[in-house]
Swiss-Prot record:
CDD domains on file: EF4_II, EF4_III, LepA, lepA_C
Annotated membrane topology: Peripheral membrane protein
Protein's name according to its UniProt entry: Elongation factor 4
EC number: 3.6.5.n1
Keyword Disulfide bond belongs to the record: no
Species the sequence originates in: Gluconacetobacter diazotrophicus (strain ATCC 49037 / DSM 5601 / CCUG 37298 / CIP 103539 / LMG 7603 / PAl5)
């Protein structure tokens, strides 16, 4: 089954903006090649996580092997990788692209080129891919194929006159896509007589088989029963099973150069699988490793704590299994006075954070609290030391800090020009600096530099709401710059609550401090004594709210008679409340934490 000559193999990925029809096109290609029977076919076959179907987005890159009898009489093997379109999963995209030689660029014929399309295309061009433009949704009344072709040529700079016009939903001209793949994409190169070199593209955990690894063979042959070695750490395994996805797992005897498939080698420890590693034969190892992927750098950090403290070990196991499946996610243990034991986790963006949280609660049945997301600051001390700050609660006193640098991004925003004004206002409110503004037809492309801290909380939601959902947004990290940043501590009854501390620009500190105090005032239940909720920068209080005391009517039992009796009781109550205020502990309910952290910043 795997003795296909190299000239008849095509490895390709599908890249596009969110909702431009990647996964639907993948369904049609699978159907056209007869890989699944009509009964097994469902919409978005490759989106096999329940979460992916629910949200209608692709999170994990998936792979499938198809055989296609072309018009030239030969039968080709097509290895398809469906990639995510979201900027938060760009790491998944870069891995898929490294395993392929060409890409189908899918563009919605009614919407045109969007910000994510650009980001993913540039990644494909960097990977030296042959790119075949495909216009999807040409059956829609609003479709303008000619305008979009001109836009592809103008914005991306690749010829689009021979773009394939299709409708993935109705199956129109799917044959044209398959023919374009066969005729326009280059075959892989490789030599099966050389020592084995295979790229580890992905890995995940199967409850029955243990760790399963997805590989792309570059040189040599990978056989069932052979001994393999991981080149990064020298770990050696015995291969139990080799196979391909069609899209079900189909075992085969061996995989040759240019092929994509999976191996199962009884790998017990999750840590031994580093995505981007090179796998070679233990007896005849390759001389050098393949160029892997650049490791992903987490951009957003937040604390995850189990609501039930007994779940800590379960959370640790769950995180290590998720890390195997999603190499772009990092975690380390930490403790908090308010929330107990938990983990500080690093993500590529807010959607990534949300998805990991959802997966932990669905796949591992964990109830978690997440602290407010923060970015990584660089802190320079007066004694000359530099450290990275992941947690706002760890920020030292201002007297020992010389300067703080925060990360900036370059954001590309595509928006119809009717909504441009609102988008520019939003960017300048968030301390943005305009770098470029160009028009492509009726759409504007704005390039801004923005502090990541301002984008992390709700920038994406606000952008969608001011542009009625039409704006699309993509960003790249763009270094660190010094800024006037302060740590705001939240104190409840004079006690600092470390989980609610955050870092903000001095200009926004007061308004954010005030809004979080007002929110907590609504959420913390009243006690028998007054509770002060304060936001402070160092020792200076910048906002305060007071929760009034519950009053118990101690004089109810007195009737008429002398005032001194009542006064005595009231004085006694006053003394008691004073003592309570001194020693009373305020329990902040779980719901108050969640609501304060979710707050629209």
């Amino acid at each position: 089954m795997t003795d296909t000559p190299l000239s008849l193999i095509r490895n390709f990925s599908i890249i596009a903006h969110i909702d431009h029809g990647k996964s639907t096109l993948a369904d049609r290609l699978i159907q056209a090649c007869g890989a699944l029977t009509a009964r097994e076919m469902t919409n978005q076959v490759l989106d096999n996580m329940e979460l992916e179907r629910e949200r209608g987005i692709t999170i994990k890159a998936q792979t499938v092997r198809l055989s296609y009898p072309a018009k030239d009489g030969k039968t080709y093997v097509l290895n398809l990788m469906d990639t995510p379109g979201h900027v938060d999963f760009a790491y998944e995209v870069s891995r898929s692209l490294a395993a392929c030689e060409g890409s189908l660029l899918v563009v919605d014929a009614s919407q045109g080129v969007e910000a994510q399309t650009l980001a993913n295309v540039y990644q494909a061009i960097d990977a030296n891919h042959e790119i075949v433009p495909v216009l999807n949704k040409v059956d829609l009344p609003a479709a303008e194929p000619e305008r979009v072709k001109a836009q592809i040529e103008e914005v991306i700079g690749i010829p689009a006159d021979d773009a394939v016009e299709i409708s993935a939903k109705t199956g129109l001209n799917i044959e044209g896509v398959l023919e374009a793949l066969v005729t326009r994409l280059p075959p892989p190169v490789g030599d099966e007589s050389k020592p084995l070199q295979a790229l580890l593209v992905d890995s995940w955990y199967d409850p029955y088989l243990g760790v399963i690894i997805l590989v792309r063979i570059k040189e040599g042959r990978l056989r069932k029963g052979s001994r393999i070695r991981m080149m990064s750490n020298g770990a050696v395994y015995h291969v139990d099973q080799v196979g391909v996805f069609a899209p079900r797992m189909v075992p085969v005897d061996d995989l040759g150069p240019g092929e994509m498939g999976y191996i199962n080698a009884a790998i017990k420890t999750v840590a031994d699988c580093n995505v981007g590693d090179t796998i070679t034969d233990d007896r005849h190892p390759a001389e050098r490793a393949l160029a892997g992927f650049k490791p992903s750098i987490p951009v957003v950090w937040c604390g995850l704590y189990p609501i039930d403290a007994d779940d800590f070990e379960k959370l640790r196991d769950s995180l290590s299994k998720l890390r195997l499946n999603d190499a772009s996610f990092h975690y380390e243990a930490e403790t908090s006075a308010a929330l107990g034991f938990g983990f500080r986790c690093g993500f590529l963006g807010l959607l990534h954070l949300e998805i990991i949280q959802e997966r932990l609660s669905r796949e591992f049945n964990l109830d978690l609290i997440a602290t407010a997301p923060s970015v990584v600051y660089r802190l320079y001390r007066t004694n000359g030391g530099m450290e990275e700050l992941h947690n706002p609660a760890d920020m030292p006193d201002g007297s020992v800090v010389e300067k703080i640098e925060e990360p900036w991004i370059t954001a590309t925003i595509m928006v119809p020009d009717d909504y441009l004004g609102a988008v520019l206002t939003l960017c300048s409110e968030r301390r943005g600096i305009q770098k470029d503004l160009t028009y492509v037809g009726t759409r504007a492309m704005a390039v801004y530099r923005l502090p990541l801290n301002e984008v992390v909380f709700d920038f994406y939601d606000r952008l969608k709401s001011v542009s009625r959902g039409y704006a699309s947004f993509d960003y790249q990290m763009d270094g660190y710059e010094e800024s006037d940043l302060v740590r705001i501590s939240i104190l409840v009854n004079q006690e600092p609550v470390d989980a609610l501390a955050f870092i903000a620009h001095r200009s926004a500190a007061e308004s954010r401090g005030r809004s979080i105090c007002a929110k907590l005032k609504e959420l913390i239940p009243r006690q028998l004594f007054k509770i002060a909720i304060q936001a402070a920068i160092g020792s200076r209080v910048i906002a305060r709210e007071t929760i009034g005391a519950l009053s118990k009517d101690v004089t109810a039992k007195c009737y008429g008679g002398d005032i001194s009796r009542k006064r005595k009781l009231l004085e006694k109550q006053k003394e008691g409340k004073k003592r309570m205020r001194q020693f009373g502990k305020v329990e902040i309910p779980q719901s108050a934490f969640l609501a304060a952290l979710k707050m629209d910043h």
